[in-house]
Amino acid sequence: KGYEHTYLGPSVYNSVKYTFRYRDQLYAGGVAEKDAGEPFAALHNRYGYDYYSFYLLLQNCGRLKSLAVGNYRLSFGQGLVMSTDYLMGKTIYASSFNNRSTGIKRHSSTDEYNYFRGVATTVALTKRLSVSAFYSHRNMDGVVTDGEITSVYKTGLHRSRKEADKKNLLTSQLTGGNVSYQQNHIRLGITGVYYVFNRPYEPELTGYSKYNIHGNHFYNLGIDYAYRWRRFSFQGETAIGKQGWASLNRLQYSPVQDIQFMLIHRFYSYDYWAMYAHSFGEGSTVQNEQGYYVGLETTPFSHWRFFVSFDLFSFPWKKYRINKPSRGTDGLIQATFTPRTNLSMYLKYRYKQKERDLTGSKGTLTLPIFHHQLRYRLNYSLNDVFSSRTTLDYNHFHSQDRAA
């Protein structure tokens, strides 16, 4: 919303990054950052920057597959229990799902929320069996009222006095592990996490947030599985928490080399909650969602790639701006042309329909909301230093005149 006069610092963004790398075995580095509007070396940032991050990652040293000290990220299975990855959403190509990496990774970005601070390690007990363990102890931003945590603040912005008062008010501890077994075409894994806060977590549980977590001690446990046979691939994960459960299963089939078909089914119960989960879906959390997603990718001609998808989803419980269970659809078609390695372009059309409460009806009337998006993007790289990206976007929102 622009620079506000209530901000405590200058309207300048600044960050410093340092990375040391030795082969593919050792990574070390640090990050310092202040957002625009945050003070530097003053007030609540008397040590200079607003955010500091340090990490050390050792990997692929015999049976020691990875060892992280400092800030790190985690991802296991399909992300129903644990994932701090930066996912690209449903518009990602079908083939990209096979390239998703899991395990322990260094946290080298300026993201002030999606990371852990402590130690994590993965050890290969045998060629087929590996074990991971991790522990994290870190401060978090939030709001505390009468000794209870009422909300967790995720933006990492501390520009005004109100935002600065939320800084580092909470302490979270997390511990857990993963056991993974792989033999030929089969892979099995178990992931468990247990986390606590230094104060009771008691957000306001009303309306659509009625089934969110509350208390002080939380856990999640999930089993992930995968099987490959010739041109078939099946992957999935099923998880439970203090209440509710979630399951995501994906089937891929490639009848010929240039065609891939994918079917994804997810079921996230309205009362399932995993604070560090991040997976495939329409919503931003692994909760209160069911759906079937179908995708088809093909490269019938040289330099051309086509992708078509359709998603039919529903929300069994209330959502933001909809006071009853609802449903929707999401369709996409995209054509990508890559004449050279340094030049590519695509044209994409997307159609989405969801339901919303009619303004002023207090949830008694709902309307379908339609979103049409047309995008053209051109990417060009002259060399390793200079590159350009041009995007043309058209968006149109509308609703029916009568309530549904």
What are these regions (language model features)?
Residues 1-40, 47, 51-57, 62, ...:
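Compositionally biased linear targeting/interaction segments
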Residues 3-13, 23, 116, 170-203, ...:
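Exposed, low-structure sequence patches enriched in small/polar residues
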Residues 33-51, 105-112, 165-168, 239-241:
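Outer-membrane beta-barrel proteins
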Residues 38-39, 85-86, 91, 141-167, ...:
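Surface-exposed beta-strand-turn/loop segments characteristic
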Residues 42-44, 93-98, 151, 202-212, ...:
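Solvent-exposed loop segments that connect transmembrane elements
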Residues 45-104, 108-141, 258-275:
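Outer membrane beta-barrel
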Residues 103-111, 146, 161-169, 175-176, ...:
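Extracellular/periplasm-exposed beta-strand and loop segments of Gram-negative cell-envelope proteins
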Residues 113-160, 168-180:
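Aromatic- and glycine-enriched pocket-lining scaffold segments that form the walls
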